[in-house]
């Protein structure tokens, strides 16, 4: 396993991945996907949320982040960036500023955003939305009312919101729906 050093911290970078072949593990050029937690803020209150107990590291130092992205690109090991939270769309201006920074460094960078769909109509105001690799929207029930109950919030995307967002995109496949199936939601 290769190791890289960033800001006096050594990090391992995998040089293998799992496959469905009999040997199951295949060696490859070391690559990584950078995960950026934009915020801890979220207007949902999911019972199963893993971010409830997560530590708030404050705001992102964009200069340091730009350094890290450039460094990983120079090493030729960065294959994409995922932006998560909390809920990234509680801070759309910061999200779009972050995306602008990423695309200024590499206009072809694969960038994915994970969201519960809160404020998703704001994406139409971002001129580079069609450059995104994907927008992963969490849905836990097909019925909007039941979905809001599971999220314990009325601030999440409705089916209509998602359809409107998809309608504004050139590539309709950018939208991915992520679902967590729970026993309490299956029969409702």
Question: What label would you give each PLM region?
Answer:
Residues 71-87:
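Short Fe-S-cluster ligation motifs
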